[in-house]
Amino acid sequence: MSETPNTNEQNNPNNQQDGTGQNPMPPMPTGKPQMPERPERHNQADGAPKRPGDDDRKSERPTWLSEFSDKEEDFASRLNTRPPQRASIITIIIIFLVAFFIGSQMMNMVHGEETDDLTTSEFVQAVEQGRVENVVYNAGEYTVTGKYYPAATAGSTIAESYNSAIESVDVKLGTILEPSNPSSVGIETTSLEEKTLGTERNYTATYVGQDSLMELLSAHPEVEYQVTLPSNVTEILISVLPMLLFAGLLIYFFSQMSKANNSQMSFGKAKAKKTTEERPDVRFSDVAGEDEAVEELQEIKDFLVNPGKYQKLGAKIPRGCLLVGPPGTGKTLLARAVAGEANVPFFSISGSEFVEMFVGVGASRVRNLFEQAKEAAPSIIFIDEIDAVGRQRGTGLGGGHDEREQTLNQLLVEMDGFEKNDAVVLIAATNRVDVLDPALLRPGRFDRQIVVDGPDVKGRVKILEVHAKNKPIGEDVDLERIAKLTSGMTGADLMNLMNEAALLTARRNKDKIGMDEVNESMERLMAGPERKTRVLNEKTRRTIAYHESGHALVGHMLENADPVHKITIVPRGMALGYTMSIPDEDKFLVSRSAMLDELAVFMGGRVAEEIFCGDITTGASNDLERATKTARKMVVSYGMSEALGQQTFGQPNHEVFLGRDYGNTQDYSPETAQRIDEEVARLMKEAHDTAYEILSARQEQMHTMAKVLLERETVDGEECQALLNNTWDEFLAKKQAEAAAKAADQAEQPQVEAEPVAQVATPAAPVAPAVPEAPQPPAAPQQ
C-alpha cells in the first residue's frame, strides 16, 4: 500500500537526496560567495519570457519534486477558483458584539485597578483637601474624571498621614527625624517634596450641576479644569444601538421559527424525484434476458406517447403495472430504462418514504405525489419496494387503524377511486407479492403483473455480453460456457461476476480478462474467497480429501445427479473443501429420482469418512442439514412418500405483518407427525446405503483420488474426468506421450535453424535434459 508523501519533508531542501541516498552538496564557488538564486516560475501560457536553460533545469529536477510542484500549482489554482463564502449579517453582528464585550472587559481588567470610583462627597472632600490635580467634566454623562492622591486611612488627618510617610521614608534611608510638633501640619524637611501623600491614581465620580462645580473649583485655582461636550453620534448610538440589537434578535428568532414551521409542514409533501430533462442513461437495449417484461413496458410507454393509436380501438391504458420477481433480476433496472426511454415526466420514490413517525404523513405524501403527477400529466410514477406500504390489511399486529393502512387506503383511492385519473400510470416493484393487499392487486389498479424471473441460458449470454461490452475480454473467454456454468444466477450476480473478474485481472497486472480470472471469480461467488493463510495438518487434509472424493464419486456414478466439474481441498470461505457440481441445463422441474440421488450425494462425504478414515467428523454437518431438509420437503410438501400418500402436511400461518412465513401450523395428529419422522429417517437411511454401496465397491479408485488431491489440491477439467472414470493411469500415459513428442520437436528445431548459419551451430546438448523430464506429468496450478 502506498503511503501519502509528507509535504513538510518534500518542501525542505535539506531533505532532498540524490540517487545514492545522500544529501547532495552544491559545489563551493571559487570567487565571491553569492546567495543561490531561487528559480522563478513563469507561466508560458501568459506570454512570460522563457529564460534559456529552463528546460534543462526542469529536466534535471527530481521526479518527485516535479510531481509535488504540479500538485501544489493544481491546489493553488483550485483554491483561487473556489467561490467566496458569504457570511450572514447576523453572524457578523454577533461576532462584533462579542469582540466588543471581550475588549471592554479586558480594558477594565487592565485599567480597573488604577481607577477609583468616588462618590460626590468624596470628590468634594478631595478637592477641598488639595488632593485633586485636574478635573475633566463630561457634560453629557455628568461625570468627572482626573488624577488625585487618595487619603491614607479613614479617620486620619493629613498631618498624621504626612508624618507617617516621612517617618517610613527616613527609616528606609537610615535616619529618624524627631518632629518638634507632631500635630502641626507644616513639617519642615529638606529631603522630601511636599506631595508625598501616596501614589497618584485615576478617579471617576458623578457630579450633577456644572454651576456648583465651577463654584467649587474657583475656590481652588490650583486644580486644572476642563469641560467636554457630548457627541451627537455617540448619543445616537447609545440610544439606537440597543433597539437595533433587540430588533435583530427578534428577526433572527422569527426566521428560525419560520424555518421550523416550514420543515414541519413539509412532512406531508412527497419526496419523489422528478426525472424530466436529466434522464438516466439506461435504455431498453441495456436490459437483457427479460424480453417479455421489456415488451410490456414498451407498450405502456407507447400508450402515453401515442394515445390515439389505442383510443380509436377502445383500449384503455393500464392504471398500474406491478413488477414481480426475486431480488437481483432487474426490476429497478427496468424502471430506470422506462425513465430513460419515456418522453413524459417520471416520478420515482421508495415505499419506505411514505412511512413516518407522525400520523397521517403517509396519506398526505400519497396525495401530494399524485397531485404532482396530475399537474405534469401524462406522467409515470414508480414506487420501489411497494410491499413496505402495500401489505395486506387486517387485525394482524398493528390493529385496524394502523398508519400503514391509512397510507394504503389513500393509495387505493388515488389509483382507482371516485375521481378519474387516466393520464397517470403507476409502476411498482416488489419481491413479496404474496403479502400485498388483494384490493391493490385487482384489475383497475394493478392491471398487469409482469414476472421478472431469473434468466435462462440465452438470457445469461445476453447479460454477459452487456456487462462485457466495455471490458477488455481475452480470446479464451467463452461467454456461452460461462452462461452454462452459472445456472441459477440472476442479472445482478452476473454483473458482479464480470466486475470481480475485472478486479482480479487488475490485481494480477494483466491487460485482458482471461478465463482463469472468470473461473476464479465464479468460485469466489459460489464458495467464498480462498483462505490461503489457513494451515491444516496432514490428518485433516487426508480426511477432507476422502470426504470430497466421496461426494464426487457418488455424484458421478448416479444417473440423475449433476455433473462434477471440480474437486478441491483448498479452504474457501467457511468450507475446508468443496466439490463443484453444475447442471448442464436449467431445471424447471425436479423428479423424485433426482431428489433421491441428491440425497445420496449429500451422504457421500459422511460415508467416505466411515469407510476410509475410521471415524466421522463435523465436516458433514451442513450435508446432513441440507439432506434432512430435502427429505422432509419430499414427505411434507411434495407428496413423494409412498407410506403417507399424495398429500401435504402443515399450513403456513397468516401473520401478514410478519411476512406470512413466520412459521407453520401443524394440522395433523401426533401419530401422523411420528410417521413423517419415520419416513424422513427411512429416506436418509436409503441414501446412506446407496452411497455406502458405491464407495465400498470402489475403494482403490477412492485411494487414487485422495492421493491425487493431496498432491495437487485441486483437479478440474480432464484431470477430474480421468479420476472419476478411473482412467488416471491412461491419462498420465497420454500426458507423458504428449510431453515426449513436444520435447522431441524442441530438440529438432535448433538443428534445422543451425544449417544456414555456421557460426551459430551448437550441439543439441541444451535440450537433452528435457528428455528425462518428459515422463513427469505437468503439475496443476496451486491455489
Swiss-Prot record:
UniProt topology in membrane: Multi-pass membrane protein
A Pfam cross-reference name: AAA_lid_3
Details of cofactor binding: Binds 1 zinc ion per subunit.
All ranges on the Extracellular side of the membrane: 108-233
Residues annotated as binding ATP: 325-332
Cellular component, GO, one term: plasma membrane
Side of membrane Cytoplasmic, spans: 1-86, 255-783
Extent of Basic and acidic residues compositional bias: 35-61
GO biological process: protein catabolic process; proteolysis
Gene3D superfamilies associated with the record: 1.10.8.60, P-loop containing nucleotide triphosphate hydrolases (3.40.50.300), Peptidase M41 (1.20.58.760)
Transmembrane parts of this sequence: 87-107, 234-254
Family annotation (CDD domains): RecA-like_FtsH
Source species, domain of life: Bacteria
Active site: 548
GO MF terms held by the record: ATP binding; ATP hydrolysis activity; ATP-dependent peptidase activity; metalloendopeptidase activity; zinc ion binding
Function: Acts as a processive, ATP-dependent zinc metallopeptidase for both cytoplasmic and membrane proteins. Plays a role in the quality control of integral membrane proteins.
HAMAP family referenced in this protein's UniProt entry, alphabetically: FtsH
Subunit structure: Homohexamer.
Name by which UniProt lists this protein: ATP-dependent zinc metalloprotease FtsH
Organism: Slackia heliotrinireducens (strain ATCC 29202 / DSM 20476 / NCTC 11029 / RHS 1)
